From Swiss-Prot:
A Pfam family per the record: CbiA
Gene Ontology terms describing biological process: cobalamin biosynthetic process
CDD domains: CobQ_N, GATase1_CobQ
Disulphide bonds in the chain: none
Keywords assigned: Cobalamin biosynthesis, Glutamine amidotransferase
Record function comment: Catalyzes amidations at positions B, D, E, and G on adenosylcobyrinic A,C-diamide. NH(2) groups are provided by glutamine, and one molecule of ATP is hydrogenolyzed for each amidation.
Organism: Corynebacterium diphtheriae (strain ATCC 700971 / NCTC 13129 / Biotype gravis)
Pathway(s) the chain acts in: Cofactor biosynthesis; adenosylcobalamin biosynthesis
Protein name: Cobyric acid synthase
Occurrences of domain GATase cobBQ-type (ranges): 256-425
């Protein structure tokens, strides 16, 4: 029963990737390993086999361990719906919307829930790799902390601090984090981990030695910048406006398929487009530009944590006009979950938006959507999962996937996330889209495996950790 906490100097320091790599590396050594994150704030989520909802990063980390997702891996999930409120998901079940202040009022109860989940995992696994949240150095939050030093204190965890050197100032980040926390928390810090290093490590070593001389804490690993990591990236990392997703590999034929993914302000499960991006000849770009929407061969309207708000944004930016012109021209559009709902005739949402009257959608599908307090959580055996409050109340459209979603000649809508990760389904879809988009020179690759690509990237991370972090020493130091 060994466990430790991987915290970060900042958000996006690379904690999730490091934990995924540790999970894979330790699992390859024959250990029974589980991931854990007490509290995650993310609109990227996954569904467990028993119908619970957790952060997608923890689902990936579980996959790295060879495990199916469990609510114990992420007992508290916050899904931001606005700048001030988030939906609170506790042990897989949505409990309502909370403000930052009201969330703090529940911290004692939530800390107990997190500790119970972690202790349950510690009883069942050889090693539990815990991930912190944001920065552990927010002293204004320490008294009610659930995920960082508060968890480490409650469960007696050693702590390793990850810093992103690619941003610059990593030594100051390490020093400041160490110095600002109190003595008891400081004593838990067992090592620093430099992440995303480029160049000659010997040039960095004098600085690391100076840091150790000042603080008495060693740097246990200098992890390299790994090019080409893109599958299952967290939140804003993978959906930057203008960014191309994935490798944009050369086409097998004479033409590419250009996919414009609309970067909604409250985009959720943005990872849905990654399966398309893994295909040779498919270029997926995040955009908010109406011209890009008009020119693309396929437009994807992804999920949203604020469907009505993001629909209003589409209209205010002119993107909705470009989408409607595509629909009139019968050029392919794919809506996923919230994106599908926006494509419908009417949306009645008293749950997430608090709207008292139905709102007109884009009207591409003759479908009415009504939001219900009870969230639909389904993990499909044949691929994909559903996470949504909105339900189809009326439809005259042909279903798309089984008896779900909607399909017209050139438009596709579904509540199902992850459907295109199924290789055969993705190939069929791309063949249809290339025909509709009049791209006869695009050739669908016959054997691309999204799962193989995911495993390849996890192994690359694990290999880097094995090479640059003494895992024998790490395991020996754990209690």
């Amino acid at each position: 029963m060994k466990s430790f906490l991987v915290a970060g100097c900042t958000s996006d320091a690379g904690k999730s990737v490091v934990v995924a790599g540790l999970c894979r590396a330790l699992t390859r050594r024959g250990l029974r390993v589980a991931p854990f994150k007490a509290q995650n704030m993310s609109n990227n989520s996954a569904v467990t086999p028993d119908g619970g909802e957790i952060g997608r990063a923890q689902a990936l980390q579980a996959y790295a361990c060879g495990l199916t997702p469990s609510v114990d891996f992420n007992p508290i999930l916050l899904k931001p719906g606005s700048d001030r409120t988030s939906q609170l998901v506790v042990r897989g079940i949505a409990t309502g919307n909370v403000s930052a202040r009201s969330y703090i009022e529940h911290r004692t109860e939530l800390r107990k829930i997190a500790s119970e989940s972690l202790n349950s995992l510690r009883e069942r696994f050889d090693v539990v790799v815990c991930e912190g949240a944001g920065s552990p150095a927010e002293t204004n939050l320490r008294a009610t902390d659930v995920a960082n030093f508060g968890l480490a204190e409650e469960c007696d965890l050693p702590v390793y601090i990850v810093g992103d050197i690619d941003r610059g100032g990593v030594l100051a980040h390490f020093y400041g984090t160490h110095q600002i926390v109190d003595d008891a928390d400081r004593a838990r810090i067992k090592g620093f981990v430099v992440n995303k290093f480029r160049g000659d490590v010997s040039i960095l070593e004098p600085g690391l030695q100076d840091l150790e001389d000042r603080l008495g804490v060693p740097t246990v690993a200098v992890l390299p910048f790994i090019h080409g990591l893109w599958i299952d990236a967290e939140d804003s990392l993978q959906s930057t406006i203008g960014a191309t997703v994935g490798p944009a590999a050369a086409p097998l034929g004479t033409q590419r398929l250009r996919v414009a993914a609309i970067r909604l302000p409250r985009v959720s499960n943005a990872t849905d487009v990654e399966a398309l991006a893994c295909e040779p000849g498919v270029t997926v770009t995040w955009t908010v530009d109406p011209d890009s929407v008009a020119e693309a061969d396929l437009v994807v309207i992804p999920g949203s944590k604020a469907t009505l708000s993001d629909l209003a944004w589409l209209r205010s930016t002119g993107v909705a006009d470009a989408i409607m012109e595509r629909a009139r021209s019968q050029r392919p559009i794919l809506g996923i979950c919230g994106g599908f709902q926006m494509m419908c005739s009417h949306i009645d949402d008293p749950v997430e938006s608090g709207s008292t009257t139905p709102v007109e959608g884009l009207g591409i599908f003759d479908v009415d959507i009504e939001f219900h307090p009870e969230k639909t959580l389904i993990r499909h055996e044949n691929g994909g999962y559903e996470v949504h409050h909105g339900r189809v109340e009326r439809s005259t459209e042909q279903p798309w996937i089984g008896n779900e979603g909607a399909r017209t000649q050139s438009n596709f809508g579904t509540h199902r996330h992850g459907y295109l990760e199924d290789d055969e389904a993705r190939r069929d879809f791309l063949g249809t889209v290339s025909t509709l988009a009049q791209r006869p020179g695009f050739v669908v690759a016959p054997a691309t495996s999204f799962e193989a690509e995911r495993n390849k990237q996890l192994d690359v991370i694990a290999d880097a950790i094995e090479q640059h972090w003494d895992l024998d020493q790490l395991i020996a130091a754990l209690t």
